[in-house]
Amino acid sequence: MMGLIGQKLGMTRIFTEEGTVYPVTIIKVKENRITQIKTISRDLYHAVQVTTGIKKSNKLLKPEIGHFLKSGVKIGKGLWEFKLTNSSINDFKIGQSLNLELFSNIKKVDIIGTSKGKGFCGTVKRWNFHTQDATHGNSLSHRAPGSIGQNQTPGRVFKGKKMAGHLGNHRVTVQNLDIVKIDLNQEIILVKGAVPGYSGGNIIIKPAIKTRGV
């Protein structure tokens, strides 16, 4: 399913004529340029590879520069792929430009981003563990996780045990966000609700897979 690459600008709110307020995320979607068409005969699957933005050539390795020169497309800030079916792959070609007109008839979208990294966190912040007693004999164990296993049997800590560790900085998908407004002149799309990641982060926008209630 074809999508677009955008950049999260931040959040705001808009009011309807009836006075209803909606929190929305503003996403800037600049020109997406197709750099490669992947086919089953050569790559064992159908996909469209795109780039967006402009990047200086001295920031790239020679193989990366050669990839852009071969496609005849301006060097972008990254490469992203969208897997497609055999029938829809013929609608695209190398060098083609894509914009928000792709979503002109779409009501809901799925958005993929990278969540905010929080660094190393304890179990209270990371997994919402309950803290131990503030007093009543407790010393230096107010935010300790407690027991992490049993005895000689099984004699190990089970995989997946909720413990302290790195929080955030994961690929996160938010599904079924309503498209509130599309402005082709300013190259922005407003979607209802929050989107993962920092302002300025790259966002993948796709038509919603689960179109419940549409």
From Swiss-Prot:
Keyword Nucleus belongs to the record: no
The record's account of how the chain is modified after translation: Methylated by PrmB.
Pfam families the record matches: Ribosomal_L3
A GO term from the CC aspect: cytosolic large ribosomal subunit
Region described as Disordered: spans on this chain: 134-153
Modified residues (N5-methylglutamine): Q152
GO biological process: translation
GO molecular function term, any single one: structural constituent of ribosome
Keywords noted in UniProt: Methylation, Ribonucleoprotein, Ribosomal protein, RNA-binding, rRNA-binding
InterPro entries, per the entry: Ribosomal_uL3, Ribosomal_uL3_bac/org-type, Ribosomal_uL3_CS, Transl_B-barrel_sf
SUPFAM superfamilies for this protein: Translation proteins
Function: One of the primary rRNA binding proteins, it binds directly near the 3'-end of the 23S rRNA, where it nucleates assembly of the 50S subunit.
Record-stated family: Belongs to the universal ribosomal protein uL3 family.
Subunit composition and interactions: Part of the 50S ribosomal subunit. Forms a cluster with proteins L14 and L19.
Descriptive protein name: Large ribosomal subunit protein uL3
Organism of derivation: Buchnera aphidicola subsp. Baizongia pistaciae (strain Bp)
Record gene name: rplC
